[in-house]
Amino acid sequence: MTREEKRIRVIQALISHQQHIANVAKQEMDSAQQQSNDYGANVDRYDSYRTKMMRARDMYAKQLSSANASLRFLDEALKMKPFDIAEHGAIVVTDKQRFFLSIGAGKFVVKDSESPTGMQYYFAISAQTPIYMAVKGKAVGDSFIINGIAQTIKEIY
């Protein structure tokens, strides 16, 4: 599998993960709005139940907005060529872990028939994380230490 094919496979897995998050946020936002509407007419401006539902709706709306912004970045990342240096948009494989330097989405799964388990775990990390700062600007063969653990970069794509 080429570097570009690996890259696309990882990004598509994260897109799927983010789409699921966006769908759940949309469903919860709609549910909170519906519960507020079903509660009846707004007779008291200090109605705590309605206020609670509106706060929940607003919270899920923020999550949906964030997920949609992440999806826009990931769509752009699909168009990028594989990287040689660890920078924003690169996928970095070390001797211990796999990172996608992109959005703060945490751990996600990529199906991989070559892996003994049939899947590999990646971590989508944002530019504000210590790991991102430690790996930024490094190339294949370079090492870095994070939380007292030395890691060597095996691949970047």
Where are these regions (language model features)?
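N-terminal intrinsically disordered, low-complexity, charge/repeat-rich segments that act as generic
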Residues: M1-M80
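Short coil/turn segments at secondary-structure boundaries
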Residues: Q27, N147-G148
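Non-DNA-binding regulatory cores of transcription-related proteins
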Residues: M80-I145, Q151
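Conserved hydrophobic positions within beta-strands
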Residues: I153-Y157
